Curated annotation (Swiss-Prot):
Transmembrane segments: none
Protein name as catalogued: 5-methyltetrahydropteroyltriglutamate--homocysteine methyltransferase
Binding residues annotated for Zn(2+), in chain numbering: 647, 649, 671, 732
Binding site for L-methionine: 437-439, 490, 605
The family this protein is said to belong to: Belongs to the vitamin-B12 independent methionine synthase family.
Gene3D superfamilies (alphabetical): 3.20.20.210
Listed pathway(s): Amino-acid biosynthesis; L-methionine biosynthesis via de novo pathway; L-methionine from L-homocysteine (MetE route): step 1/1
Catalytic residues (positions): 700
Keywords tagged on the record: Amino-acid biosynthesis, Metal-binding, Methionine biosynthesis, Methyltransferase, Repeat, Transferase, Zinc
Superkingdom per UniProt: Bacteria
The gene coding this protein: metE
Pfam families documented for this protein: Meth_synt_1, Meth_synt_2
């Protein structure tokens, strides 16, 4: 009998209950006991959903109040000294301090670095690793949650990030440290954790090792062998979980490790199934990630049943069926989407529906389909046939325009050196010009107005009048602060991707399709279901109005084609690069319209450019080629004197600096404050020719940056980049902060720029 299970479930709740609870706790509106009670209620609800669907286990360990990697760091006692907790238990407040930047005394402390989890839009807190670091079992949270599930009568499988991938995701904080020298001590704690889980009666523990789908140096491959040879004595069965891609040259390594089972991703890498079947020892379970854990399209159950029959025949009782990865990356429940049109809704499956798909597929492969399974199979086949034939998908005019694009369409009229001279004459900005990344605080009043407008309580005219008031306020505050290049603040935008998707054809929107980005931050990705085109201008009137309020050059704000693609649920019936070029052409028209409206600076944000990189370096160039061409296609229509900015956050640039330069943006703003300007090394080594705004303060922390601290960061930047090519700006947009934090932070930033002009002018 094929067993059905999942690697993890969304923890935010169908109505973002987790976000609301955590933020209420941070504000002091609820106490920790109430926060824990709400977390327990969410876990109970999610475990019950698994049982109701018919899964053979509930998965325990996928829940976190902030981040599952942070949970492991806390469990291992891997807390940076500035946050205390050197001995004893690591409590919830300590983990929040690590994430948000506070010392135990309440004074500001640098938050732990945050970066993308492999190639997803989920962000994790990077473990900080030090020479001589001591590890211990420092949290009982996992054991407590196991006891919770058992008390509710659930059969438990524990999910935990594996020891090697935890180290792989970490960062050395001691000069000359090799992370792998810490592995033995980490393994000792993992061994103790597994012993304690066994004592609780846990039979299966899933250890996530997604590092195995990447290019691993020899010493890391050896580390996997060493680690799992040591862990094989643990009195539990280990399921080694790999996902986000193919095992590739690590297949033999993964198949040969002394564990009881292996999970592979057969959505991202269906081609690896036959090779894994050939290499898997006859005693091991093989868990097939056959249902897409990262996208929302309904599974083709008939095709999967046919394709996986060979695995069923060869494995028999050793076959498990699952999603490709944790369902963390998809929304919770499609049933909540009562406003979505019936045809489009029939093409989709969210996390709750994917539980049903997993169970039905297992039943179909076993030949034990229930009437409900048969009905589900027939409904899926019918919906997918309708999707393939729907006239909503393909628009001939879009295809014709795309086919007519030439190489010249992606090139600016003049090289950067020529453009820079024209822009400096046109803009007349000071040394170290100041700007922000685009968004200003989304206040309760703004959110209330948007809700009232969407519910019909507020007319369009009244809503737009309120948004103009908010724009005027943002411009007024920037004028008072003496920001050199203001922005309109984006009060009219609910989300930097969703806003554009609502104004483009080929997109659809959900009401409850939230997924976790980091901590309490959730995003609601648009659904790209068909060909993309722009019916009309999207941002022009807002930027034009903002420009009318100031003599300074107002910066127009667009989200780039690659980021719109990466942060959407993308159609799976054509190559991603084709969809990206369709978006780029729509943005190209917007750039032309902004320029015609008198906007002299246009920012095309691409924070997700690096995120789209394949996990295997051998596949990078193909992706970078089309990603860069898409960006340039959107920007190249601009005249020489129009300055094109781009912004990238949470990015590492060393290995893609040539592609960054190939974007040919006049100014690039990047997140650097958490990395102490280390990211600029890549630009220095590459002799990057254009202008750069290295972020001088971390907007994810509520701390107010000091003037001298920002000056010192910019002085480090000026050692690597000529002062005349440096801008002064925050790391990222200010949407999630409050005005009480933003104004003093920006005032200090402007003062830092003045001091820099005194020193370098």
């Amino acid at each position: 009998m094929a067993l059905a299970h999942i690697l993890g479930y969304p923890r935010i709740g169908a109505n973002r209950e987790l976000k609301k609870a955590v933020e209420a706790y941070w504000k002091g509106d609820i106490d920790q006991a109430e926060l824990e009670r709400r977390g327990q209620a969410l876990r109970a609800e999610h475990w019950q959903a698994s049982r109701d669907a018919g899964l053979d286990f509930v998965t325990v360990g996928d829940f976190a109040f902030y981040d599952q990697v942070l949970n492991v760091s806390a469990m291992l006692g891997a807390v940076p000294p500035r946050f205390g907790a050197i001995d004893g238990d690591v409590d919830l407040d300590t983990t929040f301090r690590m994430a948000r930047g506070r010392a135990p005394s309440g004074t500001p402390a640098a938050a732990c670095e945050m970066t993308k989890y492999f190639d997803t839009n989920y962000h994790y807190l990077v473990p900080e690793l030090h020479a001589g670091q001591r590890f211990r079992v420092a949290s009982t949270r996992l054991f407590d949650e196991v006891a919770e599930a058992q008390a509710a009568g659930h059969p438990v499988k524990v999910a935990l990030l594996g020891p090697v991938s935890w180290l792989w995701l970490g960062k050395e904080k001691s000069a000359g440290l090799d992370r792998l020298t810490l592995l033995d001590d980490v393994l000792s704690v993992y061994g103790e954790i597994l012993e304690r889980l066994a004592a609780q009666g846990v039979e299966w523990v899933q250890l996530d090792e997604p590092a195995l789908v990447q290019d691993l140096p020899r010493d890391w491959r050896q580390a996997f062998e060493s680690a799992y040879n040591k862990l094989q004595s643990a009195p539990v069965k280990l399921l080694l979980a790999t996902y986000f891609g193919a095992l590739g040259d690590n297949l033999g390594l993964a198949a040969g490790l002394p564990v009881a089972g292996l999970h592979i991703d057969t959505v991202r890498a269906p081609e690896q199934l036959d090779a894994v079947l050939d290499r898997l020892p006859t005693y091991k379970v093989l868990s097939l990630g056959a249902i897409d854990g990262r996208n929302i399209w309904r599974a083709d159950l008939a095709a999967l049943r046919e394709r996986l029959q060979v695995a069923r025949a060869r494995l028999g009782e050793r076959l498990w069926i699952s999603a490709s990865c944790s369902l963390l990356h998809v929304p919770v429940d499609l049933d909540a989407e009562t406003d979505l049109d019936a045809e489009l809704k029939s093409w989709l499956a969210f996390a709750r529906q994917k539980l049903d798909e997993i169970v039905t597929l297992a039943h179909l492969l076993d030949g034990r389909a229930t009437p409900e399974d048969t009905a589900r199979l027939e409904a899926a086949t019918s919906a997918l046939d309708a999707r393939r034939q729907s006239p909503r998908i393909h628009k001939p005019a879009v295809g014709e325009r795309l086919a007519a694009v030439s190489a010249d369409d992606a090139e600016r009229a003049s090289p950067y050196a020529t453009r820079a001279k024209a822009q400096h004459r046109h803009l007349d900005l000071p040394l170290f010009p100041t700007t922000t990344i685009g968004s200003f605080p989304q206040t309760q009043d703004i959110r209330a107005a948007r809700r009232a407008f969407k519910s019909g309580e507020l007319s369009r005219d009244d809503y737009e009048a309120r948004m103009r008031d908010e724009i005027a306020h943002a411009v007024e505050r920037q004028e008072a602060l003496a920001i050199d290049v203001p922005v309109h603040g984006e009060p009219e935008r609910n989300d930097m991707v969703e806003y554009f998707g609502e104004l483009l054809d080929g997109f659809a929107f959900t009401r409850f399709g939230w997924v976790q980005s980091y901590g309490s931050r959730c995003v609601k990705p648009p659904v790209i279901f068909g060909d993309v085109s722009r019916p009309g201008p999207m941002t022009v009137r807002w930027s034009e109005y903002a420009q009318s309020l100031t003599d300074k050059p107002m910066k127009g704000m667009l989200t780039g084609p690659v980021t719109i693609l990466q942060w959407s649920f993308v159609r799976d019936d054509q190559p991603r690069d084709a969809t990206c070029r369709q978006i780029a052409l729509s943005l190209r028209d917007e750039v032309a319209d902004l320029e015609a409206a008198g906007i002299k600076i246009i920012q095309i944000d691409e924070p997700a450019l690096r995120e789209g990189l394949p996990l295997r370096q051998g596949e990078w160039q193909e992706y970078l080629d089309w990603a860069v061409k898409s960006f340039k296609l959107s920007a190249a229509v601009a005249r020489d004197e129009t300055q094109i900015h781009t912004h990238m956050c949470y990015s590492e640039f060393n290995d893609i600096i040539a592609a960054i330069a190939a974007l040919d943006a006049d100014v690039i703003t990047i997140e650097t404050s958490r990395s102490d300007m280390e990211l600029l090394d890549a630009f220095q080594d590459f002799a990057y020719p254009n202008e750069i705004g290295p972020g001088v303060y971390d907007i994810h922390s509520p701390n107010i940056p000091e003037v001298e601290w920002m000056v010192s960061l910019m002085e480090k930047a000026a050692e690597k980049i000529p002062a005349e090519r440096l801008w002064v700006n925050p790391d990222c947009g200010l949407k999630t902060r409050g005005w009480a934090e933003v104004e003093p932070a920006l005032a200090n930033m402007v003062e830092a720029a003045r001091e820099l002009r005194r020193r370098y002018g």
